């Protein structure tokens, strides 16, 4: 239900009414016994209330019966997975105090020991063997993986082979990596993959232009494994919660713990001060139709800070939230969570298209802008659902 709500609904508090005026999703709480039943969508506020009710009832049971063999543990929704999910859920629900509470239950006061061993996990693996790295990434005995699922998909072929061509809808291009993500951040000002323990793969040909992280292994046929919840994401979520609550020092401390693990020692600066982060983002332009930048306007975020204010540009709070978004964007590349950050923070997005491959020229077409206030942030329901009498999203 949470996944469906975040695909087919607007972000919580989209219009400042706490989801009370926006469509939710049909919440299936009992067996359906008729063909084409009436599926009222209710409001997004009601959807979130029902998810919270189920979550709070489930957590004590998960804590009580939290007994699994280590090799199968991550294939189950354990208490630890529930804590990580709750941290994400309450951020989206605009309750950062509860997000921090559950992240604390998971991570405690010494989170470094619970993060992925970004250096050790890939030692001895052939750097040219992307699938071997993907297999190591999802390994179910890795304590940093809190929930892994098996699924049918061809996405792993799309990302790991030459099937992601220039300007295809799945491509994370070199231009995007250079000006918004992997090569454009406070720890790395050049096009260099060596700063990362989990080094990305780079294709920079005219017809195959992409940068990708090997996360979904190719198993047999169209089956793969996806990591749904990790301690690393939970730590960055806790950092966001702390910053939104006004604890800038605490949020920065969590981010420094993560960068120390994620970046290679000796090749990249791995910890930063609040002053350094603010200076870095102060010097960047905001992204618009003519400028690519990791720095986005956040003033339309669909939540208030701890003091009831909106995000003010040029403040330390804004700079640290920009940094949180950048860290999470890089950590969760290819996982779909960036779209949720775009929705929650009301970020305007621009679709850059290559117009001259030889000159490496890009532009944003007239229809290439999606404003943070656009109703299309709620994806249209498929025709099959409409035939089943479920109300379509407004446009």
Predicted feature locations:
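C-terminal functional modules
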Residues: 303-395
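Aromatic-anchored glycine-rich loop motif in surface-exposed flexible loops
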Residues: 1-64, 68
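Hydrophobic-face positions in mid-chain alpha helices that act as interaction patches
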Residues: 38, 94, 100-232, 264-310, ...
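Structural register within alpha-helical repeat arrays
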Residues: 4, 79, 86, 231, ...
């Amino acid at each position: 239900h949470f996944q469906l709500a975040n695909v087919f609904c607007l972000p919580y508090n989209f219009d400042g009414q706490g989801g009370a005026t926006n469509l939710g999703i049909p919440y299936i709480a009992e067996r359906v016994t008729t063909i084409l039943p009436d599926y009222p969508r209710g409001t997004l506020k009601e959807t979130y209330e029902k998810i919270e009710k189920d979550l709070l009832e489930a957590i004590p049971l998960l804590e009580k019966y939290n007994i699994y063999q280590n090799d199968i543990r991550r294939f189950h929704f354990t208490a630890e997975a529930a804590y990580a999910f709750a941290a994400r859920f309450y951020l989206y629900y605009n309750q950062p105090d509860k997000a921090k509470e559950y992240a604390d239950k998971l991570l405690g006061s010494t989170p470094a020991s619970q993060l992925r061993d970004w250096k050790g996990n890939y030692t001895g693996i052939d750097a040219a063997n992307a699938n071997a790295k993907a297999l190591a990434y999802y390994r179910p005995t890795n304590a940093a993986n809190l929930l892994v699922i098996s699924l049918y998909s061809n996405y792993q072929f799309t990302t790991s082979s030459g099937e992601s061509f220039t300007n295809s809808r799945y491509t994370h291009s070199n231009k995007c990596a250079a000006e918004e993500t992997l090569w454009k951040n406070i720890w790395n000002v050049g096009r260099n993959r060596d700063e990362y323990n989990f080094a990305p793969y780079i294709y920079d040909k005219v017809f195959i232009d992409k940068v990708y992280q090997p996360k979904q292994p190719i198993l047999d046929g169209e089956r793969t494994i996806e990591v749904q919840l990790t301690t690393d994401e939970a730590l960055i979520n806790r950092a966001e919660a702390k910053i939104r609550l006004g604890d800038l020092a605490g949020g920065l401390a969590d981010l420094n713990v993560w960068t120390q693990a994620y970046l290679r020692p000796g090749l990249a600066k791995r910890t930063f001060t609040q002053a350094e982060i603010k200076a870095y983002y102060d010097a960047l332009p905001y992204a618009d139709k003519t400028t690519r930048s990791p720095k986005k306007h956040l003033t339309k975020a669909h939540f208030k800070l701890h003091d009831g204010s909106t995000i003010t540009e040029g403040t330390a709070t804004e700079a640290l939230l920009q940094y949180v978004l950048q860290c999470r964007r890089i950590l969760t590349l290819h996982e779909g969570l960036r779209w949720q950050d775009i929705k929650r923070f009301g970020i305007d997005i621009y679709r850059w298209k290559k117009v001259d491959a030889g000159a490496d020229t890009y532009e944003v077409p007239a229809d290439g802008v999606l404003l943070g206030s656009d109703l299309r942030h709620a994806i249209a329901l498929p025709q099959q659902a409409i035939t089943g009498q479920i109300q379509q999203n407004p446009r």
